[in-house]
């Protein structure tokens, strides 16, 4: 029979165990390769390490606070788009979990690292904005802020996965895994990479 000391030792061991996403994927060896996005991809601080991508934080209350949101949770929240999916966080979490398992099987890498690489590669660095009023409107190329790069990357990745899964025998989790792997490689098979290149090409033409 276990003594009180043994129980205390077990509790201490449980407390000292590292936090892993879905109790499988570690945050320790994850790095953000783009120095400009380090502050906007929430993955390296201790507060960003969570077991489940659902912190129930009030990130929309203040400007720029969403940069503090764990990056996997931002991806999860972005899946809850198109009226019929609104508010179905459990469904979105399940999709992300399955997608991460598929990524690990296909690439043998840490899925968190693959997600970060995909976001770094998918964020456009230059865009064209409309300048002028009252009829005379011209496009002008502008640089994109780091936070908007992250926002755009997440939006493009989830949009690509959603469109690929529509009327397709593949599940949304499989399509999300494919999209993330291709985006992490920088492959033009990725919807997000294609859109990013298109945005940058239009901006370059309007310099």
Swiss-Prot record:
Keyword Ribonucleoprotein: yes
A Pfam family hit: Ribosomal_S7
Tissue: Expressed in root tips, lateral root primordia, leaf primordia, shoot apical meristem and vasculature of cotyledons.
Gene Ontology MF: a single term: mRNA binding
Keywords: Acetylation, Ribonucleoprotein, Ribosomal protein
Lineage: superkingdom: Eukaryota
Transmembrane segments: none
GO biological process: translation
Keyword Glycoprotein: no
Protein name: Small ribosomal subunit protein uS7y
Source organism per UniProt: Arabidopsis thaliana (Mouse-ear cress)
